[in-house]
Amino acid sequence: MGKHHQNLLNNLEELRKLAGLTQQDLSESAEVSRKSINAIENGIYVPSTVLALKIAKTLKCNVEDLFKLP
């Protein structure tokens, strides 16, 4: 599992790269800033449910593939 916040593990960076997307590409699709995507990838920020769903839709995966409880 990739980076983690104390309450959430995430695979966002790995799955984003597998999809061939940059942070900027993903941020535009999810309608957030590139800095927000970076903060999520580095475990600094936990996304809202809506944002997590937008990211999963863009990456064509389930939210559970992206984020897990420790």
Segments predicted by a language model, with ranges:
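Alpha-helical residues within the helix-turn-helix
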Residues: 17, 28, 57
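Short, charged recognition helix plus adjacent turn
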Residues: 1-2, 67-70
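A short, Lys/Arg-rich alpha-helix, primarily the initiator
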Residues: 1-18
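DNA major-groove recognition helix of helix-turn-helix/homeodomain DNA-binding modules
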Residues: 50-65
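Short alpha-helical DNA-recognition segment
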Residues: 21-39
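Short, conserved catalytic or interaction motifs in soluble domains
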Residues: 42
